């Protein structure tokens, strides 16, 4: 099979698209499907992994929660360490081989987890998953490669919607498979990842031309070196800081949403699940359909700030809502937070060259990993501090209000950083 006039090899280059006035729609579609399938394979195991850990521990729920938390921390740590490496590798060898090998690695890793005879093997599989999942940063670099700068906000919005679609579908499919056998979702995730690798091998073209590639150097590939890129431009550092605060604020949802909704409103797992699914669907609609027209109407800078302020308002509604109805009314407001991420990505990709896009996305992913390490402890401890008997002020919504503060600070930093852009 020939793509762009050449054979479908692991490192086949395509003509760089930034000289054209329109993004390479086919290439964007390919990478968006890849993102959906990646997130689908990731989300499939969510409903069953804690239960499988508990089974290995003989039903000890408390110890299982501790081990599961360590698994999550290990996954985030691997993201922090390995995302810059994969980003630098993609700058050197191209995006295509990194994406395909990561998908292949994920597929084999899920098979390992499906066959895991002990908790140690399951833990090792989770660590490997964190390494292989670092290809998400390469997907962001691919989008930057194949999309002209003035189209990137919409393209990153579609990428965010693809993340959301895969993440909404994944747990639902995993729950159905897990009802039959707790190991079936791992086989489903393996099949999805391996099929994705096959799909990409035949249809995914390379996006980074040979002449725009950069040598691989460890000073670029290690987290500290990758983060130094963010300090190379004042605007870039400010935007990266705002993006970090966005990711940190988002950590309140997986950390305390279930605890908060159960504590304050008496909701069970099904009600919480439907609510979180509604949040994901609304955000997906905004990122998939509204980023382009809103950006065209408001401009890129105002779209970014509007998204951050909507997120801050949504979290404030969540934290102060006296009734479940008021809480649910915050969901559509929160959905417009989805404007901020694509806009921030668009601004940041404009500040670096084509040969640095992988390094940039790796640095962003490393910051996301740091947020993933900090968030669970920060928000659960805040929640405990404001509902415990020692609390001077009983405020269950304190974690959400903390996220509101983080986004307001992020909005101020982003406004200042984009003044000269």
Report residues per predicted region.
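Cytoplasmic helix-loop-helix junction between adjacent transmembrane helices
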Residues: 125-164
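A membrane-interface helix-boundary motif in multi-pass transporters
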Residues: 178-191, 381-406
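C-terminal transmembrane helical hairpin of 12-TM major facilitator-type secondary transporters
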Residues: 301-344
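Juxtamembrane intracellular "pre-TM" segments in multi-pass secondary transporters
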Residues: 15-25, 205-242
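Short amphipathic helix-loop junctions that connect adjacent transmembrane helices
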Residues: 48-65, 255-272
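Multi-pass alpha-helical transporter architecture, strongest
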Residues: 197-203, 401-421
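Helix-to-loop junctions at the C-terminal end of transmembrane segments
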Residues: 82-94, 286-300
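Conserved MFS/SLC helix-loop-helix module at the cytosolic interface between two early adjacent transmembrane helices
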Residues: 80-119
